[in-house]
Amino acid sequence: MRIVVSGGGTGGHIYPALAMIREIERRTPCEVLYIGTENGLEADIVRRAGIPFESIEISGIRRSLSFENVKTGFRFLKSVVRVRKLLRDFQPDIVVGTGGFVCGPVLYTAAKMGYKTLVHEQNSLPGITNKFLARYVDRVALSFKGSGHHFGKNKGKTILIGNPRASEVAMLQIDPVEEKRKYGFEQDRPLIVVYGGSRGAPAINKAVVDMIPKLTETDWSLLFVTGQVHYEDIQAQLGTLPDRIQLRPFIYDLPLILKASQLVISRSGASTLAELTTLGLPSILIPSPYVTENHQEVNASSLVETGASLLIRESELTGDRLFDACTKAIADQADMSKASLALGMPNAASDLVDELLRLIQRKN
């Protein structure tokens, strides 16, 4: 199997692609070519993963009228020429996009050249690039039930798959008792994990800092992942803390300790929600208000509606409100966990590869 993969800009587009690639490699001999940009995170992440990487020069379309969009149009045409050569040289069986503006010229060119094509949409609300590409590709893989209508007349091309990142988390061998022991947490105390993303989230951090005096009066444990940039300031603010409240700037193997937790406080990015539902974790979601079309709040809605999560908008976030939400979630943990697990799609990577193989066989 020869496959070209494109997706980039943020980890939310890259890590699902890598999860899919690893599942393909596990199941069948394959050759992979990844097409991204040098400015996106994919240039480093994909190369570090040992996957052949080629870059094109492309930028995103601005939603307002701008001369930059004219320049983007020229870059798009230039990229089409380069992608055409890369595809002719590599001769893939299928071309897959996982989101980000880099997918635009790659999947568009592949479809026009007659290659089988699929795009994977991680969010409930699709981005501009994937909505554009839906007109040309053979299949659109969805991560959230009910999001197909956003593709309009191309809804018939959609298939519910889930986020491949979930499959990697599902396959981890995790001993919750051992994970708590590593951090020095007592087994019989409910553990809350706060994670605002790799850079941290200042609004979440402030609310947690404000909540900690009340938290010390409970029997809860807290793992507070602040983000590298904020760690020293928060450490100075809080001073000496009891052992059951721990600060970390960042955690590389976060899913391991998540499995040992009873509640997670986080943003509602697509990969985060895939991890939470695969592990069946209750959550308090605080969507980022800084993302396109408020898609994180749309992502969170399916978890909130089924009782798997509580939602607090950042504009309404305070330490007291967060503490009250924690109290409710800890009390309702069993029901929220059951609802969360019911939304999980742990076989997403395998199901996605099955769909790729079906598309390839149809060609033949």
UniProtKB/Swiss-Prot annotation:
Keywords recorded for this protein, A-Z: Cell cycle, Cell division, Cell membrane, Cell shape, Cell wall biogenesis/degradation, Glycosyltransferase, Membrane, Peptidoglycan synthesis, Transferase
Subcellular location: Cell membrane
Membrane-protein topology: Peripheral membrane protein
GO process annotations (BP): carbohydrate metabolic process; cell division; cell wall organization; lipid glycosylation; peptidoglycan biosynthetic process; regulation of cell shape
Pathway of action: Cell wall biogenesis; peptidoglycan biosynthesis
Cited CDD domains: GT28_MurG
GO cellular component terms, A-Z: plasma membrane
Pfam family, any one: Glyco_tran_28_C
Claim: Membrane is one of the keywords in the record: yes
Catalytic activity: di-trans,octa-cis-undecaprenyl diphospho-N-acetyl-alpha-D-muramoyl-L-alanyl-D-glutamyl-meso-2,6-diaminopimeloyl-D-alanyl-D-alanine + UDP-N-acetyl-alpha-D-glucosamine = di-trans,octa-cis-undecaprenyl diphospho-[N-acetyl-alpha-D-glucosaminyl-(1->4)]-N-acetyl-alpha-D-muramoyl-L-alanyl-D-glutamyl-meso-2,6-diaminopimeloyl-D-alanyl-D-alanine + UDP + H(+)
Residues the entry annotates as binding UDP-N-acetyl-alpha-D-glucosamine: 10-12, 123, 198, 251, 296
Enzyme Commission designation: 2.4.1.227
GO MF annotation terms: UDP-N-acetyl-D-glucosamine:N-acetylmuramoyl-L-alanyl-D-glutamyl-meso-2,6-diaminopimelyl-D-alanyl-D-alanine-diphosphoundecaprenol 4-beta-N-acetylglucosaminlytransferase activity; undecaprenyldiphospho-muramoylpentapeptide beta-N-acetylglucosaminyltransferase activity
Record family assignment: Belongs to the glycosyltransferase 28 family. MurG subfamily.
Function per UniProt: Cell wall formation. Catalyzes the transfer of a GlcNAc subunit on undecaprenyl-pyrophosphoryl-MurNAc-pentapeptide (lipid intermediate I) to form undecaprenyl-pyrophosphoryl-MurNAc-(pentapeptide)GlcNAc (lipid intermediate II).
Record protein name field: UDP-N-acetylglucosamine--N-acetylmuramyl-(pentapeptide) pyrophosphoryl-undecaprenol N-acetylglucosamine transferase
Gene from which the chain derives: murG
